[in-house]
Amino acid sequence: MGAEKSSVRELHLIVGFDGSPAATRALETSARLLAVRPPGRITVVWVAHLTSTVRLSPDAVNIVEHDFDQVAQELRAAAAERLADSQVSWDFQWRQGSIAHELIAVAKSVLADHPHDVVVIEVGSSSSAMHRMVGSVAVNLAHHSPVPVTIVP
């Protein structure tokens, strides 16, 4: 009988992060999970989302994109602060579009680059009335994601 080789697959958590309390809980939960279950890494993703009903002039688009850059820098700094003591490997991406679609795109990209990783999307729950009426990001992810989705309360 030969010795079995242990192969631990890397856990790659895709965390939707907008700085809200729910997103902060999801990020902190991800860091705690990887602290007890290495190896792994976190990709923090902020998605700038304008509804399809918004029509902007080219000048207004430039202003909004500059504002998005500012917000992305602030959110990256907030994520860095939350993860500073965790010693977890992480990176930050900001994207523009539908939040669920972009989180799924990041997960697919990670799977394409690292097919042996275990990829999970982590999001914070939302209890807002608007999300109950039009559907939350978590619900959209649950219906369309090719990878597991964890909703952190």
Predicted regions and their residues:
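Short, hinge-like loop/turn segments at secondary-structure boundaries
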Residues: A60-I63, S109-V110, V139
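General small-molecule cofactor/ligand-binding pocket signal
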Residues: T43-V45, D91-R95, T150
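Structural beta-alpha unit
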Residues: M1-V8, E81-V119, S128
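Short, well-ordered secondary-structure micro-motifs
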Residues: A26-L27, V54-S57, E102-A105, H131-M133
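A short acidic, glycine-rich active-site loop
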Residues: V61-E74
